[in-house]
Amino acid sequence: MGTAEDVFRKDLKIIHGYPMVYAFALGWEKIEEFQSRPCDIVIPTYPKSGTTWLSEIVDMVLNDGNVEKCKRDVITSKVPMLEQNVPGARRSGVELLKKTPSPRIIKTHLPIDLLPKSFWDNKCKMIYLARNGKDVAVSYYHFDLMNNIQPLPGTWEEYLEKFLAGNVAYGSWFDHVKSWWEKREGHPILFLYYEDLKKNPKKEIKKIANFLDKTLDEHTLERIVHHTSFEVMKDNPLVNYTHLPTEIMDHSKSPFMRKGVVGDWKNYFTMTQSEKFDAIYKKKLSGTTLEFCTDIQSA
């Protein structure tokens, strides 16, 4: 079985061509064989794109904005992460999901190619939240500083080079967002932008409710907006990941919920780094209609 320490700060493992967290790669066949249910709601995002935020919003929408119902458990139990697996420390995502009543909300960061086939066969509804890649890189760097099941990130300069090359867990941000964007044409996928959710949360939450066939009045929408605001969630121990053991996530190095803003990348990227990112973006995503906001004033 092993212990959690056995998987701390290990190099990534390659799964079908994608770099994966070492601990999550153990027993990968359980992920591939996972059986979805037609009523499952999947939240597939690239890491550090607002996944926990969206998870809490979806849970509140399904519970008609009932705050007390949404306090029933910690977010990692309410919305299990499919590939999560830390031997000796936590029940795996697959184990949690087997015991989760329908409708299940399932979080994952898996690239399209690694998502179990059964989700496509059952035409499960999916809500993808995309965040501008520069802010993702900064947030992911700080996350890897405090998350001991990830490899050590090195310096910011070293980490950004790995991020741009796709040599981080789950691979390239560019490829991830592009593939999920293109997949929405043939599958029930609601594609949202983190920056839009920051700018007009009520409007975006209404989109989510409509997608999930839920009718919510204005008062309920406003309650969800308040309860899922960054300020409220950052202080909520049920969702800010302080419930996890310090040996897994060390919040003294960087909090799980750090800033939640648009444009923090400007505090880290040099002009040269920004130009290099832009060049890769143009090469990989210029043929799409994806439109990311990277400026805090316009978001």
Swiss-Prot record:
GO molecular function ontology, one term from the record: sulfotransferase activity
UniProt KW keywords: Cytoplasm, Transferase
Pfam families: Sulfotransfer_1
Catalytic function, reaction form: a phenol + 3'-phosphoadenylyl sulfate = an aryl sulfate + adenosine 3',5'-bisphosphate + H(+); 3,3',5-triiodo-L-thyronine + 3'-phosphoadenylyl sulfate = 3,3',5-triiodo-L-thyronine sulfate + adenosine 3',5'-bisphosphate + H(+); 3,3',5'-triiodo-L-thyronine + 3'-phosphoadenylyl sulfate = 3,3',5'-triiodo-L-thyronine sulfate + adenosine 3',5'-bisphosphate + H(+); 3,3'-diiodo-L-thyronine + 3'-phosphoadenylyl sulfate = 3,3'-diiodo-L-thyronine sulfate + adenosine 3',5'-bisphosphate + H(+)
Post-translational modification: The N-terminus is blocked.
GO CC, any one term: cytoplasm
Residues the record lists as binding substrate: K107, T108, H109
Compartments, as annotated in UniProt: Cytoplasm
Main subcellular localisation: cytoplasm
The EC number(s) this enzyme carries: 2.8.2.1
First-tier enzyme category under EC: transferase
Swiss-Prot/TrEMBL GO biological process terms: 3'-phosphoadenosine 5'-phosphosulfate metabolic process; epithelial cell differentiation; ethanol catabolic process; flavonoid metabolic process; phenol-containing compound metabolic process; sulfation; thyroid hormone metabolic process; xenobiotic metabolic process
Catalytic residues, chain numbering: H109 (proton acceptor)
Binding-site residues, 3'-phosphoadenylyl sulfate: 48-53, 131, 139, 194, 228-233, 258-260
Family note: Belongs to the sulfotransferase 1 family.
Function in brief: Sulfotransferase that utilizes 3'-phospho-5'-adenylyl sulfate (PAPS) as sulfonate donor to catalyze the sulfate conjugation of dopamine, small phenols such as 1-naphthol and p-nitrophenol and thyroid hormones, including 3,3'-diiodothyronine, triidothyronine (T3) and reverse triiodothyronine (rT3). May play a role in gut microbiota-host metabolic interaction. O-sulfonates 4-ethylphenol (4-EP), a dietary tyrosine-derived metabolite produced by gut bacteria.
Entry protein name: Sulfotransferase 1B1
Gene name for this UniProt entry: Sult1b1
